[in-house]
Amino acid sequence: MRGRRTGEGAIRRDSQNTILRKRFSGGFLSLAGANSPGGLSFRPVPILFFDEVDRFAPSAGTEGDPIRLAFARTSTFPNRKKIEVSSPSIKGKSRIEKNYETSSQAEYYDPCPACGKAQVLRFRQLDFQSGNCRCVECCELFAKHQWLDRWDERGAWVHKCPDRSTRGFWLSGRQPLDQLGNARNRI
């Protein structure tokens, strides 16, 4: 039969399992475009995830800000969550930049493999000759894997403004996504 697997864990295509909606044990996933007022206000949800918010149009049709429109759908959930992710666009006009500036502003500090100095790895620490990163304290060069081998063991998220209620995290492209999930236990 088309759209069906037989046996244990069978998945069936129906109104609960479409391209934009996936139902699974314990919940569901519903996808909507930022330009779709109907999709953004479709049903109450406890968790919202927005990807590339700096590329959102200022208005979802004639309904207004897409994030405000979708966030209104969480009002019935006291433990609601809103997650916004984006590469910043134009300085001073970036939605994610503005959100980060009003958040706790957490950055991940890695310990140097040699001296142990905790630091946020920056592009300026990259040695272009070797492709390695230089420690700001001892000036030793280390390959990326040497910094990241202990990523989740000794590093730490440091919040510049810990008293702010909104948690914001600056993620660099060098941080392995599979290890970011483990960090939630230490935030």
Predicted regions and their residues:
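Short, flexible loop motifs at catalytic/binding sites
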Residues: 1-187
